[in-house]
Amino acid sequence: MIEAAVTADAPATGPASARTLPALTQSKPARFATIMVLYFLQGVPFGLTTVALTAWLSAQGATPVEIGAFVGFALLPWSTKLFNGLLMDRFTFKPMGRRRSWILSAQFLMIAALLAMAFLAPTANDIMTLSALCFALSLCATFNDVAVDGMAVDIVPSDERTAINSVMFASQFAGIAATSAIAGSLLMAGDLRVTALVLAGIVLIATVFVSLFCERPGERLMPWSKGEASPECLKRQRSAFWPIISGVFRSLFKRHVLLLLAGMACIQSSDAFADAVAPTLGVQHLGWTSEAYSNFGAMISLVIAGAILVLPAPLKMWLGPRMAVIVPVVMAALTAAAASFTFPYWQGSNEFVLVEALMRILSWVAAIGLISWTMQICNPAIAATQFALFMAMNNFARSGYASVSGWVVEAGGYPAAYFAVSGWLVVGLVLIWLARVGDETLVTNHDD
């Protein structure tokens, strides 16, 4: 099992010893707070793109095919995270740590993308420009995401992994909820410019907070500050691409890893439904306003945040790591199948709310267990690339499902979309079972 390079509460040395704020490796509260804030910010592009803007576009008459294409293109950068990881494992400004310079740069690029959105302020009729702006925002956010994931694998002790995974994604869903509610209300007033400016302000405030903590004692807070590269950074940072690529491919071409990748990709069908199909179902079929759907998305995100904060650890303890993943996936597949067969008899919104909540909560409880497992099988020296590969496959599947979901709806209606989700979840279930998730004999000790 991977062990963190340092332990919490280690004594400060060097230039950082005079600072009042601890390094992330020294303080568990600092680690958790920083990672929570960074993951909260990852909720900004997701909440804006997959909830607020999709509801807004649906209210303006966009078809399921157009919504699916918009979401698929806007989320596409999340499937390219492998290349981000390669860059980060190869290049960094070492005096600021392995990941911090990338994180702060990504935050400022997110602000720039939101300011560009505010300046251009495309209307709902200019869906191509809106898609391009959301693509740019997602691209900036992926650098932040990969850097944070790599930092988590790098500095979080193994006994904190399950807890930190729950906190990470609970924070992301809190960010999605906040963004959905704020952006939904502002877009209802018809002002994309103000929406983008408000979100840019939120990202800026969070960036200031994150900039207060260095990764390890003695490192620089800013490029112009005093400090030097830590021994851990110098030891782990690669000086060439080939060792990174060869290490990733050695870890990839194993039966259980390939099965795990395919299974995780199949489970993403549930999120893709929420991204691309649910907005038109709620706004156009059920007659909700765009603000009502955005508020619903915010509420569901908060419920998911609470569920993944509370449920994964006890489920893992009671059921074991494998069944803690299998059971939620089985329940999600049954929920989607039931929705498919009962959809013609739905009398209003209650059935949609219940089904959407159950499918998303169950799929994400399973996802937390899977992500925790992938962190265990990652090598810290190439963590950004290796972990990014797992997440890139997930996000590519999510983007792909979203892109074609509109065609499924137009060909067979919403029951067909629910049935497709159920089918993909069953396939994912079989693959996850064959991948032997939770089998400790598959975890390799990594030498840095």
Label each residue range with its predicted role.
Residues S105-I111, V194-L212, A416-L434:
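Symmetry-related core transmembrane helices of the 12-TM Major Facilitator Superfamily/SLC fold
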Residues L76-T80, Y293-M317, P328, A332-T335:
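Transmembrane alpha-helices of Major Facilitator/SLC transporters
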Residues M323-L370:
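C-terminal transmembrane helical hairpin of 12-TM major facilitator-type secondary transporters
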Residues A12-P29, G218-L260:
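Juxtamembrane intracellular "pre-TM" segments in multi-pass secondary transporters
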Residues V51-E66, I267, A276-Y293:
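Short amphipathic helix-loop junctions that connect adjacent transmembrane helices
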Residues T80-G97, L187, A307-R322, V409-E410:
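Helix-to-loop junctions at the C-terminal end of transmembrane segments
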Residues I103-A124, V330-Q347:
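C-terminal ends and interior cores of transmembrane alpha-helices
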